[in-house]
UniProtKB/Swiss-Prot annotation:
Disruption phenotype: Delayed dark-induced and natural senescence. This is Inorganic pyrophosphatase TTM1. It comes from the Eukaryota. It is an enzyme of class 3 (hydrolase). Its EC number is 3.6.1.1. Keywords: Hydrolase, Membrane, Mitochondrion, Mitochondrion outer membrane, Plant defense, Transit peptide, Transmembrane, Transmembrane helix. It comes from Arabidopsis thaliana. Its cofactor is Mg(2+). Coiled coil: none annotated.
Length: 643
C-alpha cells in the first residue's frame, strides 16, 4: 500500500500536531482513500477530534457512502462516543450492531458470541445504503431477547454512516469500511460501565450481569474481539467513566456541628419523611490500589439484611463533596466473588442515621460507631438548594470536606478501625505482692492487675491520673490507722474507726468482684483465637456472619476486622466499657474518701471539743448515706455487668 503524495494533506508531516497525524492513503485494490494508521493510542477527546477530522477528509475524497466501523469490548464507551459524534455532526447516521442479534441463536446465555449476529441482514442493509436506497433496520428488544420490528433508514445527507458494535471490525465487514476505530478501557471501569449499561437497557439483574461478564464477556473478548481491534486505524484508550461525566452527581455538605431534629424539620418542606437506618458499609479496595490514597473504592452496603454494591468516586469542590454514585442490589455471594478477583476489604463502618427527606434534599445525622463521632449531612442534586438548606441550619464555617473513608485515610485511623483494640488483646493477670495486711494485699493486687491492663491498652493521658489516685485507695486503711494513732481517743473517733473499717471491708468486697470481672474478660479474650481458624492467607480465611434474614455470610477478610463484627467481640467490648466505667467510679469514690478524711482530721486538730458533736452527726447521717449510695451504685453496676 503506497502513499499517494499528491493527496497528502501536508508535504511535511508534523507529528507534534494531531491534525497532521490524520493522513489519507489510496487503496491498492480500489480508487477509494482511507486513513493512514495512527500508531499511538489516543485519549477519548483526542480520538474524538481525530475521527471527526478523518470523516471530513474521507467525505472530500471518496464518493458515495462513507462507512465507519467502531468496535470495542462491552461497556468500553462505544455508544457514548458515537452519540458525541452525532451531537457534533447531526447529519450522520448510526447503525448499532446489537440490533442485528438473533435471539434464536443464543447458546448458554452467551449474548457476545459472534455467531449471534445476523450478518446476512446487516450486509444487505449496507449494500442497500451504498446503492442510495432506504433500508429496513431491525429493532431488537433486549428484555425479551427478540426482534420486535424494523425502522426505515435513509442515506444521510453527510453520506457518513457509523457502524457500532463489538464485532464492527470483523473480517466480514473490514473490506467495506473506509475508517476503522477501536475503543478500549480499563477492566475496572469496563465492569462498571457494562453493569450500568445493561441495567438501563436490558433490565437484567446485576448479579446475572457480573456472572455473565466473568463467564462469557472476557473469554469472547480475548478470542474474537481483541484480534480485530488491532486492525484499527485510530485506537482510542477510553479513561472516561460514568463518574467523571457527573451527569447526575450528588452534592453533599457535611458538618460536625450539632443540629437538633427540630432545626432539620424547620429547614425542609412540610411533606418531609422521617426514618432511621442502621447500615454496615464494607469498603473494598481494588486490586493494586494503595489503601491510604485510593479514590475508587467499591462499597458493599448491608441494610435491613439486603446488600447493595455501590460504585462511586469523590471530588471535593470545597466545601462540597461531589459524589457520582451508582448503586444496585446484589447477593451476598458477590462479595466472595469480588474478593476472588483481587478486591480486599479495607474497612467496615457501622453507621446509625436519622434521616429527614423531602424529595428535594436529604438532611440526616450519622453516628459512626468505630469513630465514635456524629456528623450532619445535607445531600441533594441541586447544588444551590443544598447550600441554602445548610445555611438555614447554621452550618457555615463548620464544614468537613472529606468523606468518611477519606477521614480514616487522613487521620491514619485505618489500623484502629481494622484491628481489635489493644486493651482487649492484653492478657489480664494478677501479680503477687508483699504488703503489711491481708486487706491491703488484696486491694494492691487488684490495683496492680488493673494498672497493667491500663498501661497495655490505654493512652498515657488516661493512665497517669489513675496512677496517682488508685494507690491512695489501697493505702486508705493504713493512713487512717496512722492518723488515729496521732489523734487523741474520743467518743467520736471510735465510731469513725468502725465506719472506716466497714468501708474498707466493702471496698475489698468490691475489689473481689472486680477480680471476677477481669477474670471474665480474660476468659472471653481466650476464646477469641478458638473462634478463628488459623490461615496463612487473608483470602482463605472465612468467618460466618448471620444477617437479618437468617442467611450466612461467608467471606474472606482480615481476621481481626471480621471478629470485630461477631457477637463474641460485641460482648467483650461491652464488658470492657463496663469495666472502665467502674474504674472511674472507683476513682471518684477514692477522691471522696480522701477529701472526707482530710477535712475531718483538720477539723479535729483545730477544735476537738467543739467539733465532736458536729462530726458525730455528720458521720451518723450524711456521710454514711452518701458513701453507702455511691458504693451501692458501683456494686449494682458491677453485678449487672457480670450477669
Amino acid at each position: 500500500m503506497a502513499l499517494d503524495s499528491s493527496v497528502a494533506l501536508s508535504p511535511r508531516r508534523r507529528h507534534g500536531l494531531l491534525r497532521d497525524q490524520v493522513q489519507l492513503i489510496k487503496r491498492k485494490d480500489s480508487g477509494r482513500y482511507e486513513i493512514v494508521p495512527i500508531e499511538d493510542p489516543l485519549s477519548f477527546e483526542k480520538g474524538f477530534y481525530a475521527v471527526i477530522r478523518a470523516c471530513q477528509l474521507l467525505a472530500q475524497k471518496n464518493d458515495g457512502l462513507i462507512l465507519v466501523g467502531l468496535a470495542g469490548p462491552s461497556g468500553a464507551g462505544k455508544t457514548i462516543f458515537t452519540e458525541k459524534i452525532l451531537n457534533f455532526m447531526p447529519s450522520i447516521a448510526i447503525i448499532n450492531m446489537d440490533n442485528y442479534n438473533d435471539g434464536t441463536r443464543v447458546i448458554d446465555g452467551n449474548f457476545d458470541d459472534p455467531r449471534l449476529t445476523d450478518y446476512d441482514t446487516l450486509l444487505d442493509n449496507i449494500h442497500g445504503l451504498r446503492d442510495g436506497k432506504p433500508v429496513q433496520v431491525p429493532i431488537y428488544d433486549f428484555k425479551s431477547s427478540s426482534r420486535i420490528g424494523y425502522r426505515t433508514l435513509e442515506v444521510p445527507s453527510s453520506r457518513i454512516v457509523i457502524l457500532e458494535g463489538i464485532y464492527a471490525l470483523s473480517e466480514k465487514l473490514r473490506p467495506l469500511l473506509d475508517l476503522r476505530v477501536s475503543v478500549t478501557g480499563g477492566v475496572h471501569f469496563d465492569l462498571v460501565k457494562r453493569v450500568l449499561r445493561d441495567i438501563q437497557r436490558a433490565g437484567q439483574e446485576p448479579e446475572e450481569i457480573i456472572h455473565q461478564i466473568s463467564e462469557t464477556v472476557y473469554p469472547m473478548y480475548k478470542a474474537f474481539i481483541e484480534p480485530d481491534l488491532k486492525t484499527a486505524q485510530i485506537k482510542i484508550l477510553n479513561k472516561f467513566n460514568p463518574f467523571s461525566g457527573f451527569q447526575n452527581p450528588t452534592y453533599i455538605l457535611k458538618s460536625s456541628k450539632a443540629v437538633t431534629p427540630e432545626q432539620m424539620k424547620a429547614a425542609l418542606s412540610e411533606d418531609f419523611k422521617e426514618r432511621t437506618e442502621e447500615t454496615y458499609d464494607i469498603y473494598l479496595l481494588p486490586p493494586g490500589e494503595d489503601p491510604e490514597a485510593c479514590q475508587s473504592y467499591l462499597r458493599m452496603r448491608n441494610r435491613d439484611g439486603k446488600y447493595n454494591l455501590m460504585f462511586e468516586e469523590w471530588v471535593t469542590d470545597r466545601p462540597f463533596i461531589i459524589s457520582p454514585r451508582i448503586t444496585f442490589e446484589v447477593s451476598v455471594r458477590l462479595l466472595g466473588g469480588l474478593m476472588a478477583l483481587g478486591y480486599t476489604i479495607a474497612t467496615i463502618l457501622k453507621r446509625k442515621s436519622h434521616i429527614f427527606d423531602d424529595d428535594k434534599v436529604i438532611v440526616k445525622t450519622d453516628w459512626l460507631e468505630q469513630l465514635n463521632r456524629t456528623y450532619v449531612q445535607v445531600q441533594g442534586k441541586d447544588r444551590t438548594f443544598v447550600k441554602n438548606v445548610a445555611d438555614q441550619l447554621g452550618l457555615e464555617g463548620s464544614y468537613v470536606p472529606h468523606t468518611y473513608i477519606e477521614q480514616i485515610q487522613l487521620e491514619r485511623l485505618v489500623n484502629d478501625v481494622l484491628a481489635l483494640p489493644d486493651d482487649l488483646k492484653t492478657k489480664l493477670s494478677l501479680d503477687d505482692d508483699t504488703v503489711s495486711s491481708p486487706k491491703e494485699a488484696l486491694s494492691r493486687a487488684s490495683v496492680d492487675s488493673r494498672m497493667k491492663y491500663l498501661h497495655g491498652g490505654v493512652s498515657k493521658s488516661y493512665t497517669n491520673p489513675r496512677h496517682k489516685v488508685l494507690p491512695n485507695l489501697t493505702r486508705l486503711a493504713v493512713n487512717n490507722r496512722m492518723l488515729d494513732a496521732r489523734a487523741p481517743a474520743s467518743p467520736a473517733t471510735l465510731p469513725n474507726q468502725g465506719f472506716i473499717t466497714q468501708l474498707s471491708d466493702q471496698i475489698s468486697t468490691l475489689n473481689e468482684r472486680m477480680d471476677e470481672f477481669t477474670s471474665r474478660i480474660e476468659e472471653l479474650n481466650s476464646k477469641i483465637p478458638n473462634r478463628i481458624a488459623p490461615s496463612g492467607s487473608q483470602h482463605n480465611l472465612a468467618l460466618p456472619i448471620e444477617n437479618g434474614n437468617g442467611s450466612v455470610l461467608s467471606f474472606s477478610a482480615s481476621a481481626s476486622q471480621l471478629v470485630r463484627e461477631s457477637p463474641l467481640m460485641e460482648e467483650v467490648v461491652l464488658v470492657a466499657r463496663g469495666q472502665r466505667q467502674i474504674m472511674h467510679q472507683m476513682d471518684t469514690l477514692s477522691n471522696l474518701l480522701r477529701e472526707y478524711v482530710g477535712e475531718k482530721t483538720r477539723i479535729e486538730r483545730l477544735d476537738s471539743s467543739r467539733t465532736n458533736s458536729t462530726t458525730q452527726n455528720l458521720e451518723s447521717s450524711t456521710v454514711p448515706i452518701l458513701l453507702g449510695l455511691a458504693i451501692g451504685c458501683v456494686g449494682i453496676f458491677a453485678y449487672s455487668r457480670l450477669k
